[in-house]
Amino acid sequence: YIEIKNAGKTFLQNGETFRALDCVSLSIEKGEFICLLGPSGCGKSTLLNAIAGFSPVNEGCIKIDGMEVTKPSTENVTIFQNYGLLPWRTVLKNVQLGLEAKKVSKTERKEIAEKYLELVGLSEFKTSYPRQLSGGMQQRVAIARALAVDPEIIFMDEPFGALDAITRMKLQDDILRISKDQKKTIIFVTHDIEEAIYLADRIVVMTPNPGRVKKVVEVKLQQSRDRTSDDFLELRDKIF
């Protein structure tokens, strides 16, 4: 479904060429949950932005459904760490944003937005404004907004990185449940090994300078994942 072949990405920095990605090759199936895992500066966000079309590769190629990626697609959405909510809009109106761009009727927009707010457990906050919500709740609104447009692929760039540990674990449970129910293709950037094991079908482990794929680890755990199980801890040690 997503084919990455010998992908490379270079930038000019202070007159010198900086190589962010080097010879990255990877195949991703439709409906897979893929985590890009590695330390800061290993190119995982660069790779995510290249697949999403925000900053295409300048070596090799990336194809989605046989089409080369040269720009962002309206079929896909990206969820960032900073939520990206509009402060002057209510929660309900924020979730409707992508639907407005797709020219969905007012009545249908409201119905769809309410459905996804219910899915993320925020129905009672639909008339609230982002400033009235906690960080975790704001990220739930961002997730509802992403799902409302029924995207083909959801890109998530360290979406829970700014949250406290307990809120992060709750949102991991939410996104795992949603990914199983909605069967979306999700590409998720993280530097947290346990988060990657908890969420992913496969983990792409990356190394820095330049960003390369070190190995791809299949996560063969039960659907109900237990962070304290022997299998989980064994996999963590294997990746580490």
Regions found by a protein language model. Name each.
Residues 37-39:
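The feature captures the beta-strand-to-loop junction immediately N-terminal to the Walker
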Residues 79, 143:
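Hydrophobic anchor residue at the start of the ABC signature
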Residues 89-96:
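Short coil-to-helix segment of the ABC ATPase nucleotide-binding domain corresponding to the Q-loop/switch region
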Residues 52:
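Helix-to-loop junction immediately C-terminal to a conserved catalytic motif
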Residues 60-72:
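Conserved ABC transporter NBD signature motif
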Residues 96, 107-124, 177:
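Conserved ABC ATPase "signature" region
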Residues 154-157:
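Catalytic Walker B motif of ABC-type/P-loop ATPase nucleotide-binding domains
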Residues 128-131, 149:
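Conserved signature/switch motifs of ABC ATPase nucleotide-binding domains
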